Amino acid sequence: MNVTFLGTSSGVPTLTRNVSSLALKLSQTAEVWLFDCGEGTQHQLMKSNIKSSQIKKIFITHMHGDHIYGLPGLLATLGLSGNSNGIELYGPSELKFFVLSALKSSYCKLSFPLRFKEVEDKASFNKILFENDKLKVHCACLKHRLPAYGYRVSEKDKPGIFDIKKATDLNIPPGPIYSELQAGKTVKLKDGRSFNGQEFCGPPRKGESFVYCTDTVFSESAINLSKNADLLVHESTFSKEDEKMAYEKLHSTTIMAAKTALLANAKKLIITHISPRYTQKSLIKPSTLLLEAQKIFPNTYLAKDFLTAKIK
Protein backbone atom coordinates (compact mmCIF):
# COMPACT_ATOMS: atom_id res chain seq x y z
CA MET A 1 0.00 0.00 0.00
CA ASN A 2 1.04 3.61 -0.46
CA VAL A 3 -0.37 7.06 0.22
CA THR A 4 -0.38 10.18 -1.95
CA PHE A 5 -0.91 13.56 -0.31
CA LEU A 6 -3.37 15.65 -2.31
CA GLY A 7 -3.63 18.51 0.19
CA THR A 8 -1.44 19.37 3.17
CA SER A 9 -2.47 22.88 4.25
CA SER A 10 -4.49 23.78 7.33
CA GLY A 11 -7.66 25.85 6.96
CA VAL A 12 -7.10 27.49 3.59
CA PRO A 13 -5.22 26.60 0.42
CA THR A 14 -1.94 28.30 -0.46
CA LEU A 15 0.01 28.55 -3.70
CA THR A 16 1.98 25.43 -2.74
CA ARG A 17 -0.43 23.46 -0.54
CA ASN A 18 -4.08 22.58 -1.09
CA VAL A 19 -6.40 21.81 1.82
CA SER A 20 -6.72 18.33 3.30
CA SER A 21 -6.98 15.17 1.26
CA LEU A 22 -5.01 11.95 1.04
CA ALA A 23 -5.35 8.94 -1.27
CA LEU A 24 -4.55 5.43 -0.06
CA LYS A 25 -3.79 3.04 -2.91
CA LEU A 26 -4.39 -0.58 -2.00
CA SER A 27 -1.92 -3.18 -3.17
CA GLN A 28 -4.46 -6.01 -2.92
CA THR A 29 -6.90 -4.49 -5.42
CA ALA A 30 -7.05 -1.61 -7.85
CA GLU A 31 -9.03 0.42 -5.32
CA VAL A 32 -8.24 3.88 -3.97
CA TRP A 33 -9.59 5.06 -0.64
CA LEU A 34 -9.76 8.80 -0.09
CA PHE A 35 -9.30 10.42 3.32
CA ASP A 36 -10.88 13.87 3.52
CA CYS A 37 -11.83 15.89 0.46
CA GLY A 38 -11.12 19.58 0.81
CA GLU A 39 -11.91 22.17 -1.85
CA GLY A 40 -9.98 21.55 -5.07
CA THR A 41 -9.31 17.87 -4.41
CA GLN A 42 -10.48 16.81 -7.86
CA HIS A 43 -7.99 19.23 -9.44
CA GLN A 44 -5.26 17.64 -7.32
CA LEU A 45 -6.36 14.21 -8.48
CA MET A 46 -6.00 15.33 -12.09
CA LYS A 47 -2.42 16.43 -11.40
CA SER A 48 -1.52 13.19 -9.63
CA ASN A 49 -1.13 9.61 -10.81
CA ILE A 50 -4.32 8.62 -8.98
CA LYS A 51 -7.27 7.60 -11.14
CA SER A 52 -10.47 9.03 -9.69
CA SER A 53 -12.41 6.14 -11.22
CA GLN A 54 -10.66 3.82 -8.73
CA ILE A 55 -12.07 5.64 -5.69
CA LYS A 56 -14.41 3.26 -3.88
CA LYS A 57 -14.45 4.60 -0.32
CA ILE A 58 -14.15 8.09 1.16
CA PHE A 59 -13.42 8.61 4.85
CA ILE A 60 -14.18 12.03 6.33
CA THR A 61 -12.59 12.97 9.64
CA HIS A 62 -14.89 15.87 10.57
CA MET A 63 -17.18 18.50 9.13
CA HIS A 64 -14.90 21.53 8.87
CA GLY A 65 -14.98 22.99 5.37
CA ASP A 66 -11.31 22.47 4.58
CA HIS A 67 -11.96 18.72 4.83
CA ILE A 68 -15.29 18.41 2.96
CA TYR A 69 -15.92 21.27 0.51
CA GLY A 70 -14.45 19.33 -2.40
CA LEU A 71 -16.77 16.37 -1.91
CA PRO A 72 -19.92 17.43 -3.84
CA GLY A 73 -17.90 18.49 -6.87
CA LEU A 74 -15.86 15.31 -6.92
CA LEU A 75 -18.97 13.13 -6.63
CA ALA A 76 -20.66 15.05 -9.45
CA THR A 77 -17.64 14.52 -11.70
CA LEU A 78 -17.51 10.83 -10.84
CA GLY A 79 -21.19 10.67 -11.76
CA LEU A 80 -20.43 11.96 -15.24
CA SER A 81 -17.74 9.32 -15.67
CA GLY A 82 -20.16 6.54 -14.75
CA ASN A 83 -18.94 5.03 -11.49
CA SER A 84 -21.57 2.31 -11.61
CA ASN A 85 -20.59 0.36 -8.49
CA GLY A 86 -21.14 3.26 -6.13
CA ILE A 87 -19.08 4.80 -3.36
CA GLU A 88 -19.14 4.29 0.40
CA LEU A 89 -18.77 7.43 2.51
CA TYR A 90 -17.68 7.11 6.13
CA GLY A 91 -17.89 9.99 8.56
CA PRO A 92 -19.97 11.95 11.08
CA SER A 93 -23.76 11.76 10.96
CA GLU A 94 -23.95 15.28 9.43
CA LEU A 95 -22.06 14.11 6.35
CA LYS A 96 -25.12 12.58 4.68
CA PHE A 97 -27.17 15.77 5.07
CA PHE A 98 -24.33 17.93 3.73
CA VAL A 99 -23.71 15.82 0.64
CA LEU A 100 -27.35 15.19 -0.27
CA SER A 101 -28.27 18.85 0.30
CA ALA A 102 -25.46 20.06 -1.96
CA LEU A 103 -26.39 17.61 -4.70
CA LYS A 104 -30.12 18.33 -4.45
CA SER A 105 -29.65 22.11 -4.38
CA SER A 106 -27.52 21.95 -7.52
CA TYR A 107 -29.95 19.58 -9.29
CA CYS A 108 -27.28 16.92 -9.53
CA LYS A 109 -28.40 13.32 -9.96
CA LEU A 110 -25.65 10.76 -9.63
CA SER A 111 -25.52 7.72 -11.88
CA PHE A 112 -24.30 5.52 -9.02
CA PRO A 113 -25.44 4.85 -5.45
CA LEU A 114 -23.95 6.50 -2.37
CA ARG A 115 -23.77 4.40 0.78
CA PHE A 116 -23.32 6.42 3.97
CA LYS A 117 -21.71 4.81 7.00
CA GLU A 118 -21.89 6.75 10.27
CA VAL A 119 -18.84 6.19 12.45
CA GLU A 120 -19.85 7.56 15.87
CA ASP A 121 -20.86 4.28 17.50
CA LYS A 122 -17.94 2.33 16.05
CA ALA A 123 -15.47 4.95 17.26
CA SER A 124 -16.94 5.14 20.76
CA PHE A 125 -16.81 1.39 21.34
CA ASN A 126 -13.67 0.54 19.35
CA LYS A 127 -15.58 -1.67 16.94
CA ILE A 128 -14.46 -2.64 13.45
CA LEU A 129 -15.75 -0.13 10.92
CA PHE A 130 -15.10 -2.25 7.83
CA GLU A 131 -13.61 -5.69 7.19
CA ASN A 132 -13.00 -8.00 4.26
CA ASP A 133 -10.70 -10.98 3.75
CA LYS A 134 -7.60 -8.77 3.44
CA LEU A 135 -8.21 -5.54 5.39
CA LYS A 136 -9.98 -4.08 8.38
CA VAL A 137 -10.65 -0.49 9.37
CA HIS A 138 -10.99 0.97 12.86
CA CYS A 139 -11.73 4.54 13.90
CA ALA A 140 -11.39 6.51 17.11
CA CYS A 141 -12.70 9.77 18.55
CA LEU A 142 -10.13 12.56 18.42
CA LYS A 143 -10.07 15.79 20.42
CA HIS A 144 -11.14 18.80 18.35
CA ARG A 145 -13.69 21.65 18.48
CA LEU A 146 -16.32 19.40 16.91
CA PRO A 147 -16.61 15.62 16.61
CA ALA A 148 -13.55 14.33 14.74
CA TYR A 149 -12.34 10.82 13.99
CA GLY A 150 -9.05 9.16 13.21
CA TYR A 151 -8.87 6.09 10.99
CA ARG A 152 -6.65 3.01 10.98
CA VAL A 153 -6.37 0.65 8.00
CA SER A 154 -4.77 -2.67 8.91
CA GLU A 155 -3.79 -5.32 6.42
CA LYS A 156 -4.33 -8.84 7.69
CA ASP A 157 -1.29 -11.08 7.99
CA LYS A 158 -0.16 -12.54 4.68
CA PRO A 159 0.97 -16.12 4.00
CA GLY A 160 4.65 -16.84 4.41
CA ILE A 161 7.01 -16.88 1.44
CA PHE A 162 6.42 -19.93 -0.74
CA ASP A 163 9.42 -22.25 -1.15
CA ILE A 164 9.37 -22.81 -4.92
CA LYS A 165 12.60 -24.82 -4.86
CA LYS A 166 11.14 -27.33 -2.43
CA ALA A 167 8.06 -27.72 -4.61
CA THR A 168 10.05 -28.23 -7.81
CA ASP A 169 12.42 -30.67 -6.10
CA LEU A 170 9.36 -32.76 -5.26
CA ASN A 171 8.22 -32.57 -8.90
CA ILE A 172 5.06 -30.69 -8.03
CA PRO A 173 3.87 -29.16 -11.33
CA PRO A 174 3.74 -25.33 -11.32
CA GLY A 175 0.48 -23.50 -11.85
CA PRO A 176 -2.68 -23.07 -9.76
CA ILE A 177 -1.47 -25.79 -7.40
CA TYR A 178 1.26 -23.45 -6.14
CA SER A 179 -1.34 -20.84 -5.22
CA GLU A 180 -3.30 -23.40 -3.24
CA LEU A 181 -0.18 -24.56 -1.43
CA GLN A 182 0.80 -20.96 -0.65
CA ALA A 183 -2.66 -20.45 0.85
CA GLY A 184 -1.90 -23.31 3.24
CA LYS A 185 -4.30 -25.78 1.66
CA THR A 186 -3.72 -29.52 1.34
CA VAL A 187 -3.41 -30.52 -2.31
CA LYS A 188 -3.73 -33.98 -3.86
CA LEU A 189 -1.91 -34.56 -7.15
CA LYS A 190 -3.01 -36.80 -10.01
CA ASP A 191 -0.29 -39.31 -9.07
CA GLY A 192 -1.94 -39.77 -5.67
CA ARG A 193 0.54 -37.80 -3.58
CA SER A 194 -0.82 -35.27 -1.06
CA PHE A 195 0.98 -32.19 0.26
CA ASN A 196 0.15 -29.81 3.08
CA GLY A 197 0.72 -26.24 1.92
CA GLN A 198 1.91 -25.15 5.35
CA GLU A 199 5.03 -27.27 4.84
CA PHE A 200 6.04 -25.09 1.88
CA CYS A 201 5.55 -21.67 3.46
CA GLY A 202 7.61 -19.64 5.85
CA PRO A 203 6.06 -17.91 8.88
CA PRO A 204 3.14 -15.55 8.19
CA ARG A 205 4.18 -12.03 7.18
CA LYS A 206 2.73 -9.23 9.27
CA GLY A 207 0.38 -6.99 7.33
CA GLU A 208 0.91 -3.26 6.90
CA SER A 209 -0.93 -0.64 8.96
CA PHE A 210 -1.71 3.01 8.26
CA VAL A 211 -3.22 5.60 10.62
CA TYR A 212 -4.64 9.03 9.72
CA CYS A 213 -5.22 11.49 12.58
CA THR A 214 -6.52 14.99 11.92
CA ASP A 215 -7.80 17.33 13.33
CA THR A 216 -6.84 16.89 16.96
CA VAL A 217 -4.87 18.23 19.87
CA PHE A 218 -2.68 15.69 21.75
CA SER A 219 -4.96 12.74 22.49
CA GLU A 220 -4.69 9.38 24.23
CA SER A 221 -7.13 7.90 21.74
CA ALA A 222 -4.83 8.89 18.88
CA ILE A 223 -1.98 7.08 20.64
CA ASN A 224 -4.09 3.96 21.11
CA LEU A 225 -5.29 4.02 17.50
CA SER A 226 -1.69 4.34 16.29
CA LYS A 227 -0.15 1.49 18.32
CA ASN A 228 2.67 -0.15 16.33
CA ALA A 229 1.48 1.45 13.07
CA ASP A 230 3.86 1.25 10.13
CA LEU A 231 2.87 4.76 9.06
CA LEU A 232 1.19 7.46 11.12
CA VAL A 233 -0.01 10.56 9.28
CA HIS A 234 -0.72 13.13 11.98
CA GLU A 235 -1.70 16.75 11.81
CA SER A 236 0.96 19.25 12.88
CA THR A 237 -0.71 22.59 12.42
CA PHE A 238 1.57 24.57 14.71
CA SER A 239 5.18 24.94 15.74
CA LYS A 240 6.10 24.25 19.36
CA GLU A 241 6.47 28.04 19.67
CA ASP A 242 2.72 28.38 19.11
CA GLU A 243 1.63 25.76 21.63
CA LYS A 244 -0.81 28.14 23.34
CA MET A 245 -2.64 28.69 20.07
CA ALA A 246 -2.71 24.93 19.46
CA TYR A 247 -4.52 24.32 22.75
CA GLU A 248 -6.93 27.19 22.08
CA LYS A 249 -7.87 25.84 18.65
CA LEU A 250 -7.48 22.15 19.60
CA HIS A 251 -4.84 21.43 16.99
CA SER A 252 -1.48 19.70 17.36
CA THR A 253 2.03 21.08 17.46
CA THR A 254 5.01 19.29 15.98
CA ILE A 255 5.89 18.05 19.46
CA MET A 256 2.40 16.62 20.06
CA ALA A 257 2.49 14.72 16.77
CA ALA A 258 5.98 13.38 17.47
CA LYS A 259 5.06 12.32 21.01
CA THR A 260 2.01 10.50 19.67
CA ALA A 261 4.22 8.53 17.28
CA LEU A 262 6.77 7.84 20.00
CA LEU A 263 4.28 6.66 22.62
CA ALA A 264 2.43 4.57 20.04
CA ASN A 265 5.66 2.90 18.91
CA ALA A 266 4.86 3.83 15.31
CA LYS A 267 7.50 3.04 12.71
CA LYS A 268 7.23 6.22 10.64
CA LEU A 269 5.55 9.62 11.04
CA ILE A 270 4.54 12.09 8.34
CA ILE A 271 3.32 15.45 9.60
CA THR A 272 0.69 17.32 7.59
CA HIS A 273 -2.07 19.98 7.91
CA ILE A 274 0.55 22.74 8.07
CA SER A 275 -0.60 26.24 9.00
CA PRO A 276 -0.19 28.72 6.11
CA ARG A 277 1.57 31.07 8.56
CA TYR A 278 4.74 29.02 8.05
CA THR A 279 6.38 29.80 4.70
CA GLN A 280 9.87 29.97 3.28
CA LYS A 281 9.82 33.71 4.07
CA SER A 282 8.57 33.46 7.67
CA LEU A 283 10.74 33.25 10.77
CA ILE A 284 9.50 29.70 11.40
CA LYS A 285 9.69 27.74 8.16
CA PRO A 286 8.17 24.35 7.25
CA SER A 287 11.66 22.87 7.54
CA THR A 288 11.75 24.18 11.11
CA LEU A 289 8.61 22.17 11.89
CA LEU A 290 10.28 19.03 10.59
CA LEU A 291 13.36 19.54 12.76
CA GLU A 292 11.20 20.12 15.84
CA ALA A 293 9.41 16.80 15.34
CA GLN A 294 12.59 14.89 14.49
CA LYS A 295 14.14 15.82 17.83
CA ILE A 296 11.40 13.74 19.48
CA PHE A 297 10.78 11.15 16.77
CA PRO A 298 13.70 10.93 14.32
CA ASN A 299 11.87 8.97 11.60
CA THR A 300 9.61 11.92 10.77
CA TYR A 301 8.92 13.38 7.34
CA LEU A 302 7.17 16.56 6.23
CA ALA A 303 4.23 16.12 3.87
CA LYS A 304 3.94 18.17 0.72
CA ASP A 305 1.33 18.04 -2.01
CA PHE A 306 1.77 15.05 -4.35
CA LEU A 307 4.27 13.31 -2.09
CA THR A 308 3.81 9.53 -2.39
CA ALA A 309 5.04 7.32 0.44
CA LYS A 310 5.00 3.59 1.00
CA ILE A 311 3.28 2.39 4.15
CA LYS A 312 6.17 0.09 5.00
Curated annotation (Swiss-Prot):
Zn(2+) 1 binds at residues 62, 64, 144, 215. Zn(2+) 2 binds at residues 66-67, 215, 273. Keywords: Endonuclease, Hydrolase, Metal-binding, Nuclease, tRNA processing, Zinc. InterPro entries: Metallo-B-lactamas (IPR001279), RibonucZ/Hydroxyglut_hydro (IPR036866), RNase_Z/BN (IPR013471). Binds 2 Zn(2+) ions. It holds the Pfam family Lactamase_B. It is an enzyme of class 3 (hydrolase). The active site is at 66 (proton acceptor). The keyword tRNA processing applies. Its cofactor is Zn(2+). It catalyses: Endonucleolytic cleavage of RNA, removing extra 3' nucleotides from tRNA precursor, generating 3' termini of tRNAs. A 3'-hydroxy group is left at the tRNA terminus and a 5'-phosphoryl group is left at the trailer molecule. Its EC number is 3.1.26.11. One of its GO terms (molecular function) is 3'-tRNA processing endoribonuclease activity. Zinc phosphodiesterase, which displays some tRNA 3'-processing endonuclease activity. Probably involved in tRNA maturation, by removing a 3'-trailer from precursor tRNA. Homodimer. PANTHER family: ZINC PHOSPHODIESTERASE ELAC PROTEIN 1. Belongs to the RNase Z family. This is Ribonuclease Z. It comes from Prochlorococcus marinus (strain MIT 9515).
